[in-house]
Amino acid sequence: MALYRLIYVSQSASGLEYPDLVDILEKSERNNKKVGITGMLSFGDSMFLQVLEGSRRVVSQTYNRILIDKRHVNAELIDFSEIDYRDFGVWSMKVVQLGNQAEVRSIILKYSSSETFSPISMTGRQSLNFLRELTELYQKGVILNT
């Protein structure tokens, strides 16, 4: 079966709070596990950056459901590619809320023009590398949330 990766960015709707992120995580984990989707959702500075991995059909269907979610606006597709393997296969979904840790801000600055998280300005490759490095920080225990 061919695997695909989809990366998109969106802006949080006004009034989004931490319990909303927990709800997104719980529902995503449950739904994604059933259909073989893996991925990661990062959130900071009112912006979402998410990667989904799985079959083309299931990734497309999942993205279409995400687009109608009222908790975010201005969704924009950054990348949709066939891949050889999953980079985020450990998680049916992981939500990482970006904080002000120096390591996190350093990675943001590495792939952006400022320390403000603005994934809309990232290319597909930059987004993927950002999420990979964020995953490493999480696995090292630097990021301890959601």
Write out the residue ranges for each language-model feature.
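Charge-rich, low-complexity N-terminal segments
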Residues: 1-146
